[in-house]
Structures are given as structure tokens and as C-alpha cells.
Amino acid sequence: MRTEYCGQLRLSHVGQQVTLCGWVNRRRDLGSLIFIDMRDREGIVQVFFDPDRADALKLASELRNEFCIQVTGTVRARDAKNVNADMATGEIEVLASSLTIINRADSLPLDANHVNTEEARLKYRYLDLRRPEMAQRLKTRAKITSLVRRFMDDHGFLDIETPMLTKATPEGARDYLVPSRVHKGKFYALPQSPQLFKQLLMMSGFDRYYQIVKCFRDEDLRADRQPEFTQIDVETSFMTAPQVREVMEALVRHLWLEVKGVDLGDFPVMTFAEAERRYGSDKPDLRNPMELVDVADLLKSVEFAVFAGPANDPKGRVAALRVPGGAQLSRKQIDDYGNFVKIYGAKGLAYIKVNERAKGLDGINSPVAKFLTADIVEAILERTGAQDGDMIFFGADNKKVVADALGALRLKLGKDLSLTDEDKWAPLWVIDFPMFEDDGEGGLTAMHHPFTAPRDMTASELKTAPEEAVANAYDMVINGYEVGGGSVRIHNGEMQQTVFGILGINEQEQREKFGFLLDALKYGTPPHAGLAFGLDRLTMLLTGTDNIRDVIAFPKTTAAACLMTEAPSFANQAALTELGIPVVKKAENN
């Protein structure tokens, strides 16, 4: 039906007869002439109808926005004064000789001239996706997946599919369950990841695997999460953690170079402990120049319990955050930031405004200055590198609260005061995570997942001191987003059972949930390691949007609902009966 895409016409097509198919983006009726902007997935081109083609002109008078049409005409160059530099096709136009209205459009529920609500955009997603910016994002996503496949194929990886209907295993979130009609009362689970299957593939001898795969997690959603999402899933045998990181870094550098024309360079590597200490986060945004600086040793003897208490507590921390130019902040702004850090458990926000450093105590403004000597103030200013016009905020509490509160404040100030370089790319690897963390109930939970191997520990050493274990794990972070994470896996049955035991999974439970894995580990399992990237998040970064729903064709809301299809929906009684699922009705209030 078409010979060319609208958005691909250029001066090289001048004089050619073309047939285009697409939609009316805009119509301008000048009486004897009618101009339309015609749109398809590749872009927009101007088409005009003149009196010499009376039939086409007459039919064009009926056109309205979003009519689906076919146009045949001749490409010609625009006069210099009519060139539109803002359009890729702005140097040419199409003189229409014939027009076919394929389908008319009713009054549109989305307004092209105004910002539509996200609810409306999701309800009429098929119209929203016609917008050039949305089409471009999905085209970029398609390009990314194509680049990934070619790169992985070139590096000897095999694309192998794993099951969608599998067994529920604890991986950190709730499973989506699918009832079995054949096995009444039993349920499949949709996979949260292909984790165990890709490990089993390594045990099967396929030493380089990848898959672009759908995963499902029934969890509370955030702006950058969806109940169903897509992973670039990777696993390798006989490769060390640095070797895996090297290949995966090369993949991401390849994507940025091909999609953005940007060479990311070599990624720095930072330990979890260093990231938390310097940035208050295990996914630091290195575009932001501010860092947390420890000052507890300077404050142990001050007559101010808010500082002295944590400074003398082995589990406590006192840290300072220097804000360049922050002395300009008003009292109201400071109070607002004080309320902000309370969200993260902080009790308040002490500060020092540096007006004239050379004047010592007389050159600062601080509600805690009366508790500090001139020498202590000077030592704090020296350590933080403070200059005239800066602000220093303090966090004093247990280590987690200080990291969480000042880490979040750092990000907020970076944005509010334009200190974060939005034009920069800042990737890094974060390694050496704790293997376990407190579950809040006196037990331990796996920081990544229970199949991650510890670094340099035997099973007996791990059993004796699990809190000291460092995971052989690694996360890739770009601009403060965790875009991928992975680890070296446990390939020894004794170690795997030890980890299960530390997590409170008894032997009977181990057999019920992971018997197939424990059996497989008995038969010459190779050392293996892998990683998974979030394709949605990678695409979000590469397309410059901050909403993950913008890069998914048909996303869910933050309530895990599809406004367009009205999913989820009630199942009819016959279907439930066939599945052996009884419906319990709530008793009515009398």
C-alpha cells in the first residue's frame, strides 16, 4: 500500500512519485489549498492539495485529525523561505494527486494541543502511542534489543528460553500464581526471574546463556517499577566476577555508543561500604559532586549529646554534607529540609552557614555553634573543604539513619540547587555487598538472593559468622539508577544448604522448595556467575524520560491495573469451578 515512510522523505526523493500511508496529524484549509501534516511511525511530512487535482482537494476538505489515509503524490523541494528546519522532512513536501480515506476518526479523547493526564493516556494508549515522542521511545527500545542480541551472539552466548509456568520459590517478592486445571488445588508461579533455570543451564553445559525475558513480581509499585517487566538475563560458566563485569560493561558501552553516540569510558569500581560512606547509597549518582564526610572523631568531647552520643557509639555515626553555595538557603528552606530528613528516621538537621571562614566563629551562623569551639569548627570546615557561601548539614544517629537521611538529602539538594550535572553520564560498579542483612525480626535475609556465593569463606566459616560474610556480588549503576545486578553463584551443595539454614529454611523446606536444585548440585556443577539488566530501566535512561511507563507499550498503573483493558477482572463462576477454586463471599452487615 505504501512505497515510502512519511518521515524518511528527503531532497533525494525530489521528483519521485510516492505512496504514503498514515494519519492526519494536522490540517490547514486555505480555501483553494489544503495542507496536512501526515504522520507515520517514522515522522511527519507536509502534503498539500491544489485546485489542479479537484477530486483530491474536495476529499481533503473532509479530513480531520487522526483520519487514517493513503496519499499518492510527487515529492518536490520547498522554496527557501518555506523550509522548516524543525522537521526532518522540512526541505520537501508532497504534492498530492490522489487521496484515499481508509478510516475516519471520531472526536478524540486525547487533546493534541494540551497535556493529557496519564490516566487518559493509559486508557487510550493506542492513541498515545501515535505521538512521535512515544513512537521514538519504542523504536529506541527495539534498537536496544536488536543491539543486545547481536552483541551477545557475537560473544558466543546462546539465546535459550526458560519456562513461564514454574514453581513458587522465595526470591524477595510475592509470586503471581496460576491455578492448574489438571492438578486441582495446585498452582504454578510466574517467574520473578529465570534464576534457577539459568543456573541449571550452566549445570547442563551451556556455558554462555542469555535471554530477553518477561518477569513478574507482585509487589508495591514505584514510578520505576512494573508488575511485569523485561530483563536482559545472562549467565556464564568458568568466568570470574571481574570477567563477567568486563563483558557486561562492554555491552552497555556498546549500547550508549550506538544509541547516544556517547563513549562511557571505563567504569569505576566502588565497594558497598565506600558507596554508603561517601554517598549514603548503594547506587550513588556520581553526577552530584557532594559527599558525606565523617566528623565523629572531632565531636566526641563536645557538650552536645546529639553529636557526642553517636560519635562515641560504635554503631553510631556523625557525618557532614557540604553544600556549595548553600548559605543562600532561607530559614524556611532549611526547616523544609529538616522535615524531609525525618522521613528517613532523622530527628532533625543541624547546620553551619559559612559566611566568612576567616573570621572563625564570628564568620558562621549555626544553632549548634554554642556547643563548638573555634578549633572544632575550623577542623570541620577544613575536612569538608568548606568555603565562604557554603552550607554544612549534619547527620547524627545510627549508621543506617545517617546514610539514608543524608544520602536522600544529597540527591534532593543536587536537584533543587542544580548541582547535579544533568548532561553527564556517570556509570560505576558497586561490589562487595554484605551477604545478609537484618530482617527486623531477629533473623537474617539475603541481600541479593539465596543463591549468591560468599567471597573467600568456607561453609563452616559462613555458618560461624554469617554477619561478616561479603557477597561475591556486583551491581551496575548509572546516574543513580541500578540498571543491572548479579553475582557469582553457589556451586556447592554444602554451601547452598548452609545458606538456606542461615535464612531459617529447614531441611524439609529445602527439599520441598529446592530439591531439584540440591540434586543438580551433586553432579559436577561448574562455577558460574551471571547478571540481569532491567531493559525497561536501560531504555528509560537512553530515551531521557524519568517514567518507566513511557518506554513500555502497554504498562500498568502504580495500582497494577491496565486502564485500557480493565485488567485485572473478575473470572466467571464456570471458569473458577473448572479450576476447582471456591469463591468465599463476605457476609453482609446487618
UniProtKB/Swiss-Prot annotation:
Matching InterPro entries: Aa-tRNA-synt_II (IPR004364), aa-tRNA-synth_II (IPR006195), aa-tRNA-synth_II/BPL/LPL (IPR045864), Asp-tRNA-ligase_1 (IPR004524), Asp-tRNA-ligase_1_N (IPR047089), Asp/Asn-tRNA-synth_IIb (IPR002312), AspRS_core (IPR047090), GAD-like_sf (IPR004115)
GO biological-process terms attached to the record: aspartyl-tRNA aminoacylation
Superkingdom field: Bacteria
GO cellular component, one term: cytoplasm
UniProt keywords, alphabetically: Aminoacyl-tRNA synthetase, ATP-binding, Cytoplasm, Ligase, Nucleotide-binding, Protein biosynthesis
Chief subcellular location: cytoplasm
UniProt cross-references to SUPFAM superfamilies, sorted A to Z: Class II aaRS and biotin synthetases (SSF55681), GAD domain-like (SSF55261), Nucleic acid-binding proteins (SSF50249)
PROSITE patterns in alphabetical order: AA_TRNA_LIGASE_II (PS50862)
Binding site for L-aspartate: 171, 217, 448, 489
Enzyme class: ligase
Entry binding sites for ATP: 217-219, 226, 482, 534-537
Region (Aspartate): 195-198
Annotated EC: 6.1.1.12
Annotated localization: Cytoplasm
One Pfam family per UniProt: tRNA-synt_2
Reactions catalysed: tRNA(Asp) + L-aspartate + ATP = L-aspartyl-tRNA(Asp) + AMP + diphosphate
Keyword ATP-binding: yes
GO molecular function, one term: nucleic acid binding
Similarity comment: Belongs to the class-II aminoacyl-tRNA synthetase family. Type 1 subfamily.
Matching PANTHER family: ASPARTATE--TRNA LIGASE, MITOCHONDRIAL (PTHR22594:SF5), ASPARTYL/LYSYL-TRNA SYNTHETASE (PTHR22594)
Protein's job: Catalyzes the attachment of L-aspartate to tRNA(Asp) in a two-step reaction: L-aspartate is first activated by ATP to form Asp-AMP and then transferred to the acceptor end of tRNA(Asp).
Name under which the protein is recorded: Aspartate--tRNA ligase
Organism: Salmonella paratyphi A (strain AKU_12601)
